[in-house]
Structures are given as C-alpha cells and as structure tokens.
C-alpha cells in the first residue's frame, strides 16, 4: 500500500486503485518503479507456479489450452490469443521495465519479494494473506487487495480448493453420509467454537482480519453467514484495503475457473519455460516458443490421455 500511495494510486476513499485490465496494471507498475525505484510487479516463473498463474492471464486473452474431441485431448494454445498473452508478459520486462531483475522466481520467492518490500504488486488470494505477515513480518496495514484485472476477452479468476481424505475402509453408506455432511449449509455450535478458536490464534499472531475467502456456500447459507458475521466483528485493519477484493467475490463479470483438466502440473512446467524465455531474451519469438511448447505438451503428455 505504501508504494501505491507514493505513486498516487490510493483513491480518496482509501481503497487501492483498481486496474481495469492487465495493461493498466502494467502502466501502474511502470509508474510505481519510476517513482519509488522498486519493481511495480512480481510474478512467478518457476517451479510450476509461473505457468499456473499465467493460465489466469491467458484465459482473459481468450486462450483455451486444451480440448477434448472424440475421446482424445488436443493441445490448443499455439494461437494468436496465447501469443498476445505471452507478449504481454514479455512487455512487462522489456517495454514497461517493471519486474525484479531476477527472472527465476518460484512460488515461495514471489511472495517473499512482495512481502519484504521488493515489489509493489503481485498475485494473491484472501486465504494466502496470513503467510505474508507470519513468514515475513509484513505490516498488516500495508497489505491491500483488489479484483483481478480483465483481459481483452474477459476477467477470469483461478479457483483454489482443499483436499479431504476419506478412509478406504469406509463402506458406500458411510461415503454417502460423508459427502452429504460436506455439503451441509448449516453449522453446528461445536464447529463455530472450533472456528473461533483457530481464528483467534491468527489474531494473536497479528494476522489481519479483513479479506473474505471465496466459499462454495452462498452468502445466505447459515455457514457462510456465520463466517461473514465473525469477520465483520473482528476486522482489525482498514477495511478499505480489501473492499474492492471483497466486493469482487460477488461480481458476476468475473468468471471463476478451476485448473486445467488434464496434466495441469506438466502444462505449468512447460509454460514456466515459455515465460523464462521471453524474460531472458528481448528478441524472443513468442509464436515460435508457443508452437514448440504446444507440440511438446501434446507429444509428451496429452497423447497418453485416453479419456
């Protein structure tokens, strides 16, 4: 928030400026670096994290990474849309000059760079903010969030999730009961107390209470209503810091998408290589890079997918 303030990107109501699209974000990042001397934006490029978050940018440019037809999967990202998306990332380095000098940035490093004042903006989520404070002693008041910017073909946000393990010793009746329980919109008093206890631990560690977390439950469900009421009663930061992000969770113009349906981690690794090439070489050919990447993904991974 401090670097945005220095560059004039805090609005009169205290909210951080919302970039309408990825190109405005690049312009903001460029100005922030010019004013503060610090990189305006950092994005991961390694350990599959770069490819993972690049899909979110690319969807906004109209990219479809794979298609299934007649039971076979085909790689489909050697397109003009993906060339444009990769060119955008290339321009962050060579046109806008707003990235850190180190271009090999993994999933841990980009959060550390941001949280320790090495860059003004990065990707984030409501559930990912506590580690910024816990791991790197970031001032919780210096952390703000806005909605995902739009691409030429729309606004897309990558959904997260969690793993729930069910014992292989359970029978079918037990499994049905478990899935029914997972979908209950009610919340018991025991669950409420457990939630309050766990969240109080965060508060005691100085974690901010402010950003909402995207939920599979509707706002009107008893469970979500409890979560929202608790958050509102325990907010410990300037709510303007997170207002635009919180509002965006109910914004119908943002399309939520799950990760790619086949060989996602392998795709991310290949896309990491694409990002690194365009950030290392000012003369890199985005189309040639994507043609090779598309071919490799098809031959090395999708050809083995039977359904």
Segments from the language model and where they lie:
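Periplasmic solute-binding protein
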Residues: 1-14, 26, 43-71, 86-89, ...
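Short helix-loop capping/hinge motifs at secondary-structure junctions, enriched
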Residues: 3-12, 35, 94-96, 139, ...
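Short, solvent-exposed loop/beta-turn-alpha elements that line the ligand-binding surface or hinge
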Residues: 14-18, 63-84, 135-137, 147-156
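Short helix-initiation/N-cap motifs at beta->coil->alpha
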Residues: 19-24, 101-116
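Glycine-centered hinge/linker elements that transmit conformational signals in sensory
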Residues: 24-31, 71-103, 148
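Bilobed periplasmic-binding protein-like "clamshell/Venus-flytrap" ligand-binding domains
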Residues: 34-46, 188-197, 299-307
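Alpha-to-beta junction loops
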Residues: 37-39, 116-125, 141
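C-terminal lobe and pocket-closing loops
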Residues: 128-139, 153-158, 164-269
């Amino acid at each position: 928030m401090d670097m945005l303030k220095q560059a004039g990107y805090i609005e009169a109501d205290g909210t951080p400026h919302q970039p309408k699209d990825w190109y405005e974000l690049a312009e903001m990042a460029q100005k922030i670096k010019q004013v503060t001397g610090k990189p305006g934006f950092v994005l991961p490029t390694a350990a599959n994290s770069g490819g993972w978050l690049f899909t979110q940018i690319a969807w906004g440019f109209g990219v479809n990474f794979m298609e299934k037809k007649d039971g076979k999967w085909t790689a489909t990202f050697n397109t003009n849309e993906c060339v444009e998306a990769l060119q955008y990332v290339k321009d962050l380095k060579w046109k806008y000059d707003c990235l850190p000098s180190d271009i090999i940035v993994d999933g841990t490093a980009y959060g550390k760079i941001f949280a320790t004042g090495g860059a003004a903006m990065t990707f984030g989520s409501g559930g990912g903010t506590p580690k910024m404070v816990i791991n790197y002693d970031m001032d919780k008041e210096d952390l703000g969030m806005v909605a995902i910017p739009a691409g030429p073909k729309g606004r897309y946000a990558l959904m997260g999730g969690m793993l729930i393990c069910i014992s292989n010793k359970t029978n079918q009746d037990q499994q049905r009961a478990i899935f029914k329980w997972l979908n209950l919109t009610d919340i018991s008093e025991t669950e409420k107390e457990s939630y309050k206890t766990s969240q109080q631990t965060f508060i005691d560690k100085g974690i901010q209470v402010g950003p909402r977390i995207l939920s599979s439950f509707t706002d009107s469900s008893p469970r979500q209503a409890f979560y929202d009421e608790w958050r509102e009663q325990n907010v410990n930061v300037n709510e303007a810091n997170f207002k635009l992000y919180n509002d965006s969770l109910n914004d119908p113009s943002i399309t939520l998408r799950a990760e790619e349906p086949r060989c996602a981690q392998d795709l991310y690794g290949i896309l990491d290589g694409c990002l690194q090439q365009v950030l290392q070489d000012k003369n890199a050919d985005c189309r040639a890079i994507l043609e090779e990447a598309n071919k490799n993904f098809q031959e090395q991974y999708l050809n083995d997918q039977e359904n």
